[in-house]
């Protein structure tokens, strides 16, 4: 809570156990299809990065290349985190196409579950792309918005996430431009 108050980050109403809330509600792309995905119950995940994005957003199209590079490199050094895609697309078809076309290496919340997970909506922002970094109990540690309305972009919360998972990352590792909220 101190991190939330200090940085004017949105707060969730109560603590949630993220892995439990996501059980049975995730999918992942496998080349040309979408399949159910299960978090490994034997492996505790300390940090989650929820990536709110949409196929129709040019800002998301710019940022996803950087996020994929980050994910692949970070997974070679740290296994104790997960990125979860939260679609802001208008249909399940658009979400699936986006996941497959971009070859997203991380899981996503099933389209039919997006409105059923209150903490996911509470942790989001008004526009995309948006990053919300949570610990395993639902404390928001970094966010693309300050005070729920001031968009700061994706760079700062991604850098904070890298520190939390003890991964040395610099946006100079990639030539992608900072995403602009849409």
Where are these regions (language model features)?
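Thioredoxin-like thiol-disulfide oxidoreductase module
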Residues: 88-127, 132-133
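Conserved redox-active cysteine motifs that mediate thiol-disulfide chemistry
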Residues: 52-69
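Solvent-exposed loop/turn segments at secondary-structure junctions
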Residues: 54-58, 88-93, 113-115, 138-140, ...
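N-terminal targeting signals for export/organelle localization
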Residues: 1-30, 181-182
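Thiol-/selenol-based redox modules, centered on thioredoxin-like
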Residues: 134-182
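A short beta-strand-turn-helix
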Residues: 21-48
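Hydrophobic beta-strand anchors of alpha/beta hydrolase catalytic cores
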Residues: 49-50, 131
């Amino acid at each position: 809570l101190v991190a939330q108050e200090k940085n004017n980050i949105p707060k969730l109403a109560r603590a949630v156990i993220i892995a439990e809330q996501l059980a049975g509600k995730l999918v992942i792309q496998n080349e040309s299809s979408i399949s159910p995905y299960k978090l490994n119950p034997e492996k505790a995940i300390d940090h989650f990065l929820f990536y709110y994005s949409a196929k129709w957003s040019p800002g998301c199209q710019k940022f996803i290349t950087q996020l994929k590079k980050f994910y692949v490199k970070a997974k070679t050094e740290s296994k104790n985190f997960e990125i979860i895609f939260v679609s802001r697309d208008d249909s399940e078809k658009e979400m699936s196409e986006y996941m497959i076309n971009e070859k997203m290496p991380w899981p996503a919340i099933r389209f039919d579950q997006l409105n059923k997970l209150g903490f996911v909506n509470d942790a989001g922002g008004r526009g995309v792309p948006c990053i919300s970094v949570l610990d395993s109990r639902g404390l928001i540690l970094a966010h693309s918005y300050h005070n729920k309305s001031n968009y700061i972009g994706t760079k700062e919360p991604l850098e904070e996430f890298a520190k939390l998972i003890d991964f040395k990352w610099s946006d100079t590792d990639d030539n992608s431009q900072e995403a602009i909220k849409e």
